[in-house]
Structure formats: C-alpha cells, structure tokens
C-alpha cells in the first residue's frame, strides 16, 4: 500500500507544479495594457505629454547604451528620466548654439587690433568689453569717437571701433537680463557655459521649434519588421494589429513565446500587417459597406449577385466599381451581356441593386463615370484587358462555388485583388 501511495502523491505534486508553472507562464509578469502587441503601449494622453517634452524630440535610438538597445523603451514608461532633466545629459548643441548665436559673444580681435593695444591704453574698454562695459557702450558711443581719429591712420582705426559698434547694439537686449556676469568673462571660455547656466537658472529655449513638433522616435531592438518608426502620429490605441507582436515578451523571456494572445491580452487583430486595408475617401462611405458591418445578409449587392449567378460579372463590377472607384473596373455600361437602361447605366440581373445604391461608391468618382453615353464603345483591346476573366483575380476559385456561404467574406475581400496589366 505505501508503495502505491507514494507514486500517486508524487503525481499529484507534479501535476500541481506543472499547473502552477503553466499559470505563471500564462499570466504575464508585467500587466499588459490593451494595445498593439509589439509596440510600447502608450495612451493618447501620455503621448501628448511626452511629445510636448523637448528632450524626446531627439533621435533616442542613439542612446548612451549603444544603438537600438532596449533601454529606450524604459524612457517611454518613465522608468528612466527623460533626456531634458539633467544639464549634463542635455545635448551639446544647446550650449554651443546659445553660446554662438542667441547670446552673441564678442568676436575675436581683428589682426589689426593687437597693434593698437599698447599704443592706446585709453581704448581698452573697446578691445576687451565685459558685460558691464558693453551695456554702457551705447551711452559712451558719442563721446570717444572724436579723439579716435586724431593722429592715427584712419584705416586701422575705422576697423576696430566699427566692429565693436556693430556688435554692441545687438548684444544689449540679451545681455541686459544678466547684469552681474563679470565672472563669466569670455577670457575663460571653458567656464563660460557653466557659469552662464548657474547664474541664469533655467535657460529659456530661444531655439526655433523643431521641424516636426509632434513626433518623437522610438527604437525597437529586434523589431524592424512591422513596427512604425514614429509614435507621434498614432498612439498604440489607434494602430492596426501587427503580426502577433514580435517583441512583446518573447524577446525578453523566451517562455512567453507561444501564449501571448491567450490571457490578459487582446485577441490578435484579424487585419494583419501583411494584408491590405481599404481606405475610403468620403466619410459617409467609411461608415457603410460590407466591411463595416452591413453584412452580406442585409441586401448588399455582393450577396445578391452571388446568390443569383455565382459567376456573373455583376459581382466583380459592383464590388470593383464601388471600392476601387472604377479605376480598375469596367466603366459603367461597358459590362458585356447586361441590358442597358435609357441612360446607359447597367441594369444588371433583377436581383442586383443598381450601381447608384452601392454603399461603397465614392460620390466624386461616381459622377466622373456617368459620362459614358449609351452608344459609345471601348476599343476591343481595352475591353479584353478590363473584363473580369479568371486571370484577373487569382482568388476567383472561391467565387465559383455556388452555395458556399462560408466563403462569402473571403469573396468580398479577395475579389478586389487585381493583377497588374
């Protein structure tokens, strides 16, 4: 008896342990928010807050940890501070740009000026202007000019003061905000940015705003496959589903590979990234149509044409003229074997609604294609090129099954794939 009980006991333990392991692998360690599996899931509010930060507009792929490392996704979730929070992590071009352009520093002395320095000790405020003298400079401008031109060659003299007088008025508006910056002399230029940052406090951003204000960039370590390069346009709430999310948890923990969509995640989106999607031009047409829930059962022309005659060209003409707008389809009235109405429009077999009631028809393209008269004919080559034979749709074997209702969504989707002529 004890020999029988021990294996049962061990079996129970093993089953329990296996169940716990399965549960621990199925329940994600990090709670999944609904969103695209491979993309860092950010809500719209978080995206707008992050997009307003100046520091995230840089290309964060070039991080301190090397190219394309996964540490950048930690910035997205706020686990690491953003770039703009530390002065020493701020990119170098802020300092140099303000040092050179927005706060104009005095230009280097011209080659003619050092010869003037020992001759005229009275001119030293012009040659080494500190912040204080440059503020007083416009006041003194009228006073020292008459003695300048006495007894000196005019060319050298004109060069020196003219440059300084051009610089001084442009300096005065920015420098007037910082009156006491004598320790930040341009004679010690390595100290100058640090001293200016300390004395000035937070630097006002007088940079022009970046070219694409709403975008910031994210890098994905392994996921060059399907993920977008920018998140500023769409948040991950709005994106269509990517191919099962190559970087969700399978990249970090290989145990999570197969069971990603099971528990706690959204079901994988049926419109995979590899498939095509339809874009409707008019907002009215985007709300209707068989894709948007009007279904084949409610009398859309696709279903009726299919029940009437599975191989009738009206199926292709209705769908193609509605969705592709007639660009690849027959123009109206040019469908062979169909009776024409008085206006030259195809009446079709009796079960088919006329093409004006087609919910997918874009209004602008419908008007453009009314212009064919009743008696016009297209040339033979064009008509042969545009008729819907079995070479035009590689998936048309679905349409030849007469009563197969299960294939109808497949028909609707696949009838719009045309080969290039």
UniProtKB/Swiss-Prot annotation:
Record field: compositional bias (Polar residues): 388-410
Glycosylation sites: 112
Protein name as it appears in the record: Ameloblastin
InterPro entries in alphabetical order: Amelin
GO BP annotation list: biomineral tissue development; cell adhesion; odontogenesis of dentin-containing tooth
Metal-binding in keyword set: no
Signal peptide: 1-26
Organism lineage: Eukaryota, Metazoa, Chordata, Craniata, Vertebrata
Keyword terms of this UniProt record: Biomineralization, Extracellular matrix, Glycoprotein, Hydroxylation, Phosphoprotein, Secreted, Signal
Subcellular location: Secreted, Extracellular space, Extracellular matrix
